[in-house]
UniProtKB/Swiss-Prot annotation:
Any one GO MF annotation of this record: phosphoglucosamine mutase activity
Cofactor: Mg(2+)
CDD domains reported for this sequence: GlmM
Domain of life: Bacteria
Naturally occurring in which organism (per UniProt): Vibrio atlanticus (strain LGP32)
Record PTM text: Activated by phosphorylation.
Biological role stated in the UniProt entry: Catalyzes the conversion of glucosamine-6-phosphate to glucosamine-1-phosphate.
Lineage: Bacteria, Pseudomonadati, Pseudomonadota, Gammaproteobacteria, Vibrionales
Binding site for Mg(2+): 103, 242, 244, 246
Protein known as: Phosphoglucosamine mutase
Stretches assigned to coiled coil: none
Entry GO CC: cytosol
SUPFAM superfamilies, sorted: Phosphoglucomutase, C-terminal domain, Phosphoglucomutase, first 3 domains
A biological process term (GO) from this entry: peptidoglycan biosynthetic process
């Protein structure tokens, strides 16, 4: 739709806790507004999960109050990965799923994102309808119609069994040592159990959430601890999840990082080998040229979507394809799940490792990653770095120097005043200096 959303960003409503809109009063009203819209859809039942941020308790209570005022029943799962909430929303035939999380962001941020009854992101139409309700004063339903809350005590067990069901039944992980880094986030009590029950020897780190340590120097956004542990333990590989369990970054037996592009490449190549690949692969504007070239050599079609898993999903649905990914670790496998699921994606790579009797490092060799540098540059909230003449001039200079063997991409964050500067090319030193040149232009002028 052409109408602009005021509160919903690319991944729900997100911000710093205690600052609008992530305040108890706004979240209560958001719960009521969502409840008003969803109550018209059908069952009046909503699944609510969260990650391990301390603010999750406060926001959970506010959401529940708002939903109850609109006459909806809330079912709490406790700390649960985002894809688990999508799965449970489907299996419980709920009208919607709600996740309280800011994904890979620091603990002092939080957010609210919604899933439809099919376990997919809400449509623009529904989000706009919720925003329209936010402009109204809260009106409670009749006392006899108020919603109530219940707790789902076996949510973790249900999701663990689902994850295991996506791994080939005749395979086992016996004899494989795996380091699992849960980022002190929502997978902390899920991921180790999944891999352990499939037979692996699991060394778990990032599994001691205290409310403020989520994503701090651990997990998919900072794999240094995971790399060190894999080498120290002489493990077969490492799995790094982000705070809400929808991103996966892997580490091979040598301690090398294996990102979302490489993970999708391995999964697609394996599906092609088995004759089960349906169509091609959807990446994003950030996808490494090496992945595109590697897939091309295999004869696998590839297209780029705008950055963001919702846009990858749009392309997948439009083309009828099943595999999509972002290099940040969102991997969507529509033949198994309805949204990015880090544990399920990891299991598909592990199946390839077991079946091929190759190491993760060997499986990653099929594609050559171009050196790629990403600089995150903060700017003044009221400026637009994409329109700054000095920034434009720096980009032109860099593009001229890189020629046809590289590319530049500037992208504003959908959730904060941050410009992502990506430079890619064959020469690592040139790529690094080029990214810094553009970043410096942003800092000096915006």
């Amino acid at each position: 739709m052409s109408e602009k959303r005021r509160y919903f960003g690319t991944d729900g409503v997100r911000g710093k806790v205690g600052q609008y809109p992530i305040t108890p009063d706004f979240v209560l009203k958001l719960g009521w507004a969502a409840g008003r819209v969803l109550a018209k859809q059908g069952t009046k039942k909503v699944i609510i999960g969260k990650d391990t941020r301390i603010s999750g308790y406060m926001l959970e209570s506010a959401l529940e109050a708002g939903l109850a005022a609109a006459g909806l029943q809330a079912t709490f799962t406790g700390p649960m990965p985002t894809p688990a909430v999508a799965y449970l929303t489907q299996t419980f035939r709920a009208e919607a799923g709600i996740v309280i999380s800011a994904s890979h962001n620091p603990y002092y941020d939080n957010g609210i994102k919604f899933f439809s009854s099919e376990g997919t992101k809400l449509s623009d139409e529904i989000e706009l309808a919720i925003e329209a309700e936010l402009d109204k004063d809260i009106e409670c339903v009749e006392s006899s119609e108020l919603g109530k809350a219940v707790r789902l005590n076996d949510a973790a067990g249900r999701y663990i069994e689902f994850c295991k069901s996506t791994f080939p039944h005749k395979m086992t992980l016996a004899g494989m040592k795996i380091v699992v880094d849960c980022a002190h986030g929502a997978t902390y009590h899920i991921a180790p159990a999944v891999f352990k029950e499939l037979g692996a020897e699991v060394v778990a780190i990032g599994v001691e959430p205290n409310g403020t340590n989520i994503n701090h120097e651990v997990g998919a956004t900072d794999v240094r601890a995971l790399q060190a542990k894999v080498v120290e333990e002489k493990a077969a590989l490492g799995l790094g999840f982000d705070g809400d369990g929808d991103r996966i970054i892997m580490v091979d037996e040598l301690g090398n990082k294996v990102d979302g592009d490489q993970i999708a490449y391995i999964i697609a190549r394996d599906a092609l080998r088995r004759g089960e690949l349906k169509g091609g692969v959807v990446g994003t504007l950030m996808t490494n040229l090496g992945m595109e070239n590697g897939l091309k050599q295999l004869g696998i079609p590839f297209v780029r979507a705008a950055v963001g898993d919702r846009y990858v999903m749009e392309q997948l649905l439009a083309k009828g394809w099943k595999i999509g990914a972002e290099n940040s670790g969102h991997v969507i496998l529509l033949d198994k799940v309805t949204t990015g699921d880090a544990i399920v994606a990891a299991l598909q790579v592990l199946a390839s490792v077991v079946d091929s009797e190759m190491t993760l490092n060997e499986l990653s060799q099929g594609m050559t990653l171009y050196p790629q540098v990403l600089e995150n540059v903060r700017f003044s909230g009221d400026s637009n770095p994409l329109e700054a003449e000095a920034v434009k001039a720096a980009v032109i200079e860099v593009e001229t120097e890189l020629g046809e063997k590289g590319r530049v991409l500037l992208r504003k964050s959908g959730t904060e005043p941050l410009l992502r500067v990506m430079v890619e090319g064959e020469d690592a030193e040139l790529v690094q200096s080029s990214a810094l040149k553009i970043a410096d232009a942003v800092k000096a002028n915006c």
